[in-house]
Amino acid sequence: MSQFAILGFIALGGAFGACSRYLVSELCVVLLGRGFPYGTLTVNVVGSFIMGLLIAAFESELLATEPWRQIIGLGFLGALTTFSTFSMDNVLLMQQGAFFKMGLNVVLNVTLSITAAWVGFQLLKS
């Protein structure tokens, strides 16, 4: 497969990931309000779960073809999840003096994202 085709697959996945991130974030604001960065937390945990599934699928050769790795892994999940937004959310919480919320956000993002990746991986491995 040519490098141009691979870049096209990554861009396609990225477009869907970015749109999904926006929609999930907006839905979280509607459902849960703006008092906590629920949107970032949600996309990071869901993205980690999908990555766990994806890694297990590649290992078991359920998704052995290379375009899927680029479309889902680099494109979709790369655009869906975000460390820079997570960092900025925490800076804003710090500036507001909301140190408990900031700490909670850090703990929840790290713990739930790693747990979700492990659960996703285990689901397809067993």
Curated annotation (Swiss-Prot):
GO BP of this protein: cellular detoxification of fluoride
Keyword Transmembrane: yes
Extent of the signal sequence: none
Disulphide-bridged cysteine pairs: none
InterPro entries, alphabetized: FluC
Residues involved in Na(+) binding: 78, 81
Keyword Lipoprotein: no
Main location as per UniProt: membrane
Superkingdom of the source species: Bacteria
Free-text activity regulation comment from the record: Na(+) is not transported, but it plays an essential structural role and its presence is essential for fluoride channel function.
Compartments (UniProt record): Cell inner membrane
Stated role: Fluoride-specific ion channel. Important for reducing fluoride concentration in the cell, thus reducing its toxicity.
Family: Belongs to the fluoride channel Fluc/FEX (TC 1.A.43) family.
PANTHER family cross-referenced by the UniProt entry: FLUORIDE EXPORT PROTEIN 1-RELATED (PTHR28259:SF1)
Protein name (database record): Fluoride-specific ion channel FluC
Native source organism of the sequence: Vibrio vulnificus (strain YJ016)
